[in-house]
């Protein structure tokens, strides 16, 4: 089995696609009007308009209703990203903090309220854990 993507459902596709394009520096592919994909080296971030939910079953997902998932990106320098993103991010949850498991992280909400974590492994153990990934 191969992990292929994570999909965010939104009522405002263009706004959310623009946010993630600015966050990642990657231009989204648009295989269909209500759908976009940002293809990163490790996984694809898919963004679908809420009208696509009916294709999976009415009510199977609700835009902006995520309370249990954090979308995470490993970056080279989380402190530099924090500085870069200050004008893009409206709601910061956590400023740069070194976590007990060895990652230095920032946590914020995207325009739909989804939690996003950017992190850099900073301890020797964390650096070793991510080698080869």
Q: Which residues are covered by each model-predicted region?
A:
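Vicinal oxygen chelate
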Residues: 1-4, 26-72, 82-109, 120-133
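Short hydrophobic/aromatic beta-strand micro-patches
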Residues: 9, 72-74
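Conserved beta-strand-loop-alpha-helix junction that forms the acyl-donor binding cleft
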Residues: 10-12, 100
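Helix N-cap motif at beta-to-alpha junctions
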Residues: 12-13, 76-78
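Conserved active-site tyrosine of GNAT-family acetyltransferases
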Residues: 16-21, 85, 113
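Acidic active-site catalytic centers that drive phospho-/nucleotidyl reactions
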Residues: 77, 110-112
């Amino acid at each position: 089995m191969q992990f292929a993507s994570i999909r965010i459902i939104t009522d405002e596709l263009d706004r959310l696609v623009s946010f993630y394009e600015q966050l990642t520096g990657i231009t989204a592919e648009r295989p269909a009007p209500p759908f976009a994909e940002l293809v990163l080296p490790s996984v694809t971030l898919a963004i679908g308009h809420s009208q696509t939910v009916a294709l999976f079953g009415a009510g199977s997902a609700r835009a902006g209703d995520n309370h249990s998932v954090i979308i995470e990106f490993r970056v080279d320098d989380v402190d530099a990203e924090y500085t870069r993103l200050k004008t893009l991010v409206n709601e910061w949850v956590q400023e740069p903090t070194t976590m007990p498991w060895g990652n230095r992280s920032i946590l914020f909400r995207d325009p739909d309220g989804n939690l996003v974590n950017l992190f850099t492994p900073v301890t020797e153990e964390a650096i070793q854990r991510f080698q080869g990934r």
